[in-house]
From Swiss-Prot:
InterPro entries: Trm112-like (IPR005651). This is UPF0434 protein Mmar10_2939. Belongs to the UPF0434 family. HAMAP family: UPF0434. GO terms for cellular component: cytosol. It comes from the Bacteria. SUPFAM superfamilies: Trm112p-like. The lineage of its organism: Bacteria, Pseudomonadati, Pseudomonadota, Alphaproteobacteria, Maricaulales.
Amino acid sequence: MSDTQTRDVDPKLLEILVCPVTRETLRYDREAHELISEGAGLAYPVRDGIPIMLPDEARQLDD
């Protein structure tokens, strides 16, 4: 993977981001490069350190 793909999300950004569906806080999965919304059961991708907070771009979490 290139360095741009492995960039982490800014911790300050994580403090203010919420799930657009549930408005709940998100958990960052560093290995998968995703922001996890437990309430919505969605994983939002992080590309080049930028969270893609569109429900249509999110992956449905497995139960």
